[in-house]
Amino acid sequence: MVIALDCDNVITNTTACVLAQHYADTGEKLTLDDIKGYYIENYVGDDYKDDFHLIFFKKEMWKRVQVLPHCVEVVKRLHDKGNEIYFVTSTEPQNVAKKARFLQRTFPFLDIRKCLITTHCKQMIGVDILIDDYEMNLINGSYFGILMDYPWNANFDDASDDKIYRVFDWLQVEPMIEYIQTLKNSNENKAITSGDIAKNPSVINSSIIPLLLDDKQIGVVRQIENGVMSGEISLGNLSIEMLQLSDSKYEVKAIRIKH
């Protein structure tokens, strides 16, 4: 499959670093949870709005940026399986060269000269899957979308679009891609609901599926073997990992607070 990856907040923790740099420059402290929409400048103080875009040209800000956990190892496995990997970004032209160098250092097994795409209209690219943190880049595309969960896309009802699936970290990306591959192969674009699972566990024919509650995705369910399922449910800022022991009994394996 042909898989395209957004860069900021999909590969790297860019917004977290922007907020850290903004705090260092101004003393105004904001967290990811404060950013309820895609454009950060809408959430800073009025005194900082006009010049906020200049923060993206500061070397000290970009020095803070780190690759998200498990990203490189998952991309490497996807590449080794024969998938074509592309990076697609709306980076300003003057920053493209720096981003290309960063990507080449981070993903030495790829030739960035052949796989970096810059565009403000991602719907124009012809790929099988786009991974992005901005839901508007996924809507109305010819591709399946994987939405990386953040506060600024929390209000997007991904269950309303049968080609967009939400994940919460890179460990969920690879099995979600496998699930989408299953959908493509079977020409089925319908998510399986928790009710479907309860009525007929055999409907699970891939390693991961979305878990829906009242038509809203609250997590994912993974089949381990012999019909045994594990799952992760997101409730607010709590992530609950569970293992099904029987039809009516679940074991809570871990409860994590998402920051």
Describe each PLM feature range.
Residues 1-50:
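Active-site neighborhood of HAD-like aspartate-dependent phosphohydrolases
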Residues 45-62:
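Conserved non-catalytic scaffold segment of RNase H-like nuclease domains
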Residues 59-86, 94-97:
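Short, acidic loop-to-helix structural element flanking the phosphoryl-transfer center
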Residues 89:
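Conserved phosphate-coupling serine/threonine residues in phosphotransfer and NTP-handling enzymes
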Residues 92-194:
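C-terminal cap/substrate-recognition subdomain and adjoining C-terminal extension
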Residues 188, 192-213, 229-232, 237:
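Conserved active-site motif detector
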Residues 220, 225-239, 243:
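Acidic, low-complexity, intrinsically disordered interaction modules
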Residues 231, 252-255:
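Short linear proline/tyrosine/threonine-rich motifs used for host-factor recruitment
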